[in-house]
């Protein structure tokens, strides 16, 4: 079960887009280690386009097109405008209202959930590039872990990007736990933020173990599951 509801996610989204926006007062040419070939400006352009794409989906039964960023528009203002439009549309609409989504349920609330980890992970990408230490709310990170297990991996499998996993990897954060795959099981206990970054391949298993995570069961099992195409 997710630790957040629609209203809680919207509050977190407001905070996350504001935190990402503050990154745009730094060096826009700083390389982003988590996204090879991108700098902070490229990352912000990507995220701003995703926000606008999601906003378009809220009022459509069909997949919207990605719109390019006009080259003459200042990046920080363009990002802020798109983020504000997304938050405003989500706040104005019933989370149960039908719309196009990447995966069931095909309702507005899907995007309220999807855009939070999207923004959180990219904020985590941007801040180290600017020498700023990132942090994440534990419940928000746990909601993102649940989304990978409940939405992203099933979608990857349905699209033929990932076959069924022959091993299982259980992820634990305190009393919360999630299981990926089936069969021989490894169990990793770590803070939810580390688990989220691990699933989105912003951390390696070695990184989180060095930071104090505890692994029981075969390490090879954990590595096999984590190497899979769990997310796009």
Task: Describe the function of each predicted region.
Residues 1-25, 230-232:
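Actinobacteria-biased recognition of intrinsically disordered, low-complexity terminal regions
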Residues 69-78, 139-155, 215-229:
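Short, mixed-charge aromatic SLiMs
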Residues 59-111:
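Hydrophobic/aromatic-rich structural module bridging two neighboring secondary-structure elements via a short loop
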Residues 6-14, 37-44, 72-80, 109-113:
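Amphipathic, non-membrane alpha-helical segments in soluble helical-bundle scaffolds
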Residues 18, 26-65, 103-158:
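Short, contiguous alpha-helical
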Residues 185-232:
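C-terminal interaction segments
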Residues 137-183, 187-188:
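Hydrophobic protein-protein interaction segments
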